[in-house]
């Protein structure tokens, strides 16, 4: 059975991801106490079901401490994948304010007994980060701070479609003006390269469009930058594989995340295609984005 565990920070889009998995034919359960997961998987497998998606969050409390070992145990019997959703505290506060929802840890005891109850939303968010931090290393992380719901659904679809063998190498483009992705393992700043934005004909395009590609490919400094990044990754990738990492996210950032970072992320993904499980995504470029869609909530 394939089991997708969705976890992360409340307000980061777990419901959106779970709905996307339900649409893809998964048997979905929200807020399942972790101790019931092995029993549920056994029951559903016996009932002929082969796809299960479960959302687990900080409301599980102390049970989260047992999750790392449970994931290891389940992985010996099933194809287990963990999807960890995250977002900046600022984005989360804005979402809770707009939806008028209460954070699940609001009013719960603080980590320090002398403090009493968690009264502010920011305190509850930070406490939740502490509780679920141990699960982040097991899964593929997605920073939803600037994502629209339809883009998250698309990324979840790609996540379940990819092969789950060895290290998955993710190249992610982004714009520094919207912040560095929280899910990045390596961040490369390419803002020093010539910017197609200042060419009026190239400004409305992206790094996927041929005129922008031709512009950047012709610049020796761009080729040198990509060569340096490629050499660095070629040197250190074996160490990450030996460490049994499931995912490695390489973030490429320019000013707006539309031209230079998109082109370089795509080019590097193509160069590393022979490595096997290579994924590319563009956080801030206007690609496959319906402007009428709401941000993840």
Swiss-Prot record:
InterPro entries: P-loop_NTPase, RapZ-like, RapZ-like_N, RapZ_C
Coiled-coil ranges per UniProt: none
Binding site for ATP: 8-15
Keyword Ubl conjugation: no
Binding locations of GTP: 57-60
SUPFAM superfamilies attached to this UniProt entry: P-loop containing nucleoside triphosphate hydrolases (SSF52540)
Pfam families given in the database record: PapZ_C (PF22740), RapZ-like_N (PF03668)
Swiss-Prot/TrEMBL keywords: ATP-binding, GTP-binding, Nucleotide-binding
UniProt GO molecular function: ATP binding; GTP binding
Function: Displays ATPase and GTPase activities.
PANTHER family attached to this UniProt entry: RNASE ADAPTER PROTEIN RAPZ
Protein family per UniProt: Belongs to the RapZ-like family.
Name of protein: Nucleotide-binding protein Bphy_0322
Species annotation: Paraburkholderia phymatum (strain DSM 17167 / CIP 108236 / LMG 21445 / STM815)
Lineage: Bacteria, Pseudomonadati, Pseudomonadota, Betaproteobacteria, Burkholderiales
